[in-house]
């Protein structure tokens, strides 16, 4: 059906030069003997890998894009990818409707346009593998198997939500699905993901709780803006030092709220930061689910074999503003139309039909099925009860100074403004 992928055939994570900057590449200097930690100890060889599988976004890129051929996918795999991406898109569109109708509160960040990244990575995971997300986490939860009705109920703040209504849009957790969060502040989730990967390695090597597939893998999702934070660099260092089974997935949608990625970092090619820590750095077209899947498969299998972490930069684009409160006035119309024409769902649909993996009517039936799933999720969330007042106190371990918190779950406070503020709780 298709030739071996450019990633697998040309690299296998071993290419020592970036396809996007081959003319500027200089081999790293050997480590001086004085850098050895112990007298007489030879420094360990460093893996210096930076590979661009494709490129589209960054200006000034003169390198030819990677071959368009995809690795073969079966009919079942293609339809699974399509269904998951359509679920993410339709679910997020419904979230926008419900938000503007006053059914959701606070900030709501949608994932439209980035579905190829979530689907391409998460659908390759086992149940025991972990996902750590950001504030843009609804679709990651859906891809990991959290039911749409549980995610929608959480967005509605209902007791039937995956966090019993206490997490909301930016804090999706599900213990049964090993979804370890949504984290509202950028970079917060990366140390959690690194810790989860350490726990997986400890279980495997120390407790001998191994699975036949190898190590459990953790995916850490974060955006381009996070890559200028200290936690990012600290965790890359620790993960490579201990060869942790983790994949760092950068969803580079080119904008950190209203700040262009090209104005926020000294080197906009994030994947090149991987080799600085001795781990592979890979760039992939995040608007193409099949290319993402190729790279994800190799990175996940590499982690599962105990060969350590990988940094993957997925260049993608969000089709809506930063949040539903963002009028999206800073991005140029021609930029938005360029990426709208590269819609990852439309591209996959075209591929499936051209490869005779399914008919258009079969794909329409999937879309109808997902419409029904999302409609049912809204009905379920709307009919679900609000959390009881006493639930607020379940995880409060001390009485805040100045307030009395009774065992009946009701606040008592001398300050009438506080009482007014919590009257509707």
UniProtKB/Swiss-Prot annotation:
One of its GO terms (biological process) is pyruvate decarboxylation to acetyl-CoA. Thiamine diphosphate binds at residues 135-136, 184, 186, 224-225, 253, 322. Tetramer of 2 alpha and 2 beta subunits. Pyruvate binds at residues 109, 135-136, 184, 186, 224-225, 253. It is an enzyme of class 1 (oxidoreductase). It comes from Oryza sativa subsp. japonica (Rice). GO terms for cellular component: chloroplast. The keyword Magnesium applies. This is Pyruvate dehydrogenase E1 component subunit alpha-3, chloroplastic.
């Amino acid at each position: 059906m298709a030739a071996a992928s450019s990633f697998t055939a040309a690299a296998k994570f071993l290419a020592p030069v970036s396809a996007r900057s081959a003319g500027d590449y200089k081999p790293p200097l050997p480590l001086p003997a004085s850098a050895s930690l112990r007298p007489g100890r030879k420094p360990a060889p460093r893996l210096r890998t930076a590979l661009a599988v494709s490129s589209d976004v960054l200006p000034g890129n003169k390198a030819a894009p990677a071959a368009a051929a995809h690795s073969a996918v079966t009919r079942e795999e293609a339809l699974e990818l399509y269904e998951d991406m359509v679920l993410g898109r339709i679910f997020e569109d419904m979230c926008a409707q419900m938000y503007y109708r006053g059914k959701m509160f606070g900030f709501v960040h949608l994932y439209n346009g980035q579905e190829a990244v979530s689907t391409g990575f998460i659908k390759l995971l086992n149940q025991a593998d972990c996902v750590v997300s950001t504030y843009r986490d609804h679709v990651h939860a859906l891809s990991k198997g959290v039911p749409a009705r549980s995610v929608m109920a959480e967005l509605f703040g209902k007791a039937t939500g995956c966090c019993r209504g206490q997490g909301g849009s930016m804090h999706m957790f599900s213990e049964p699905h090993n979804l370890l969060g949504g984290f509202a502040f950028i970079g917060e989730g990366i140390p959690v993901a690194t810790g989860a990967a350490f726990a997986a390695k400890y279980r495997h090597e120390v407790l001998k709780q191994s699975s036949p597939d190898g190590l459990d893998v953790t995916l850490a999702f974060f955006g381009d803006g996070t890559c200028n934070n200290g936690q990012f660099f600290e965790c890359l260092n620790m993960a490579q030092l201990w060869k942790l089974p983790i994949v760092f997935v950068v969803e580079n949608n080119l904008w950190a709220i209203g700040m262009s990625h090209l104005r926020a970092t000294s080197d906009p090619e994030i994947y090149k930061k991987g080799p600085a820590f001795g781990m592979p750095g890979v760039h992939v077209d995040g608007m193409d689910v099949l290319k993402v899947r190729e790279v994800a498969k190799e990175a996940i299998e590499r982690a599962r074999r105990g060969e350590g972490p990988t940094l993957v930069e997925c260049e993608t684009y969000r089709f809506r503003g930063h949040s539903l409160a963002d009028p999206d006035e800073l991005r140029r119309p021609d930029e938005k139309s360029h990426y709208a024409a590269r819609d990852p769902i439309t591209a996959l649909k075209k591929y499936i039909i051209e490869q005779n993996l399914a008919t258009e009517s079969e794909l329409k039936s999937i879309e109808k099925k997902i419409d029904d799933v999302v409609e049912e999720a809204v009905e379920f969330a709307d009919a679900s009860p609000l959390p009881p007042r006493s639930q607020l106190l379940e995880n409060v371990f001390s009485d805040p100074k100045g307030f009395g918190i009774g065992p009946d779950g009701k606040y008592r406070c001398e300050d009438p403004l506080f009482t007014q503020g919590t009257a509707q709780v």
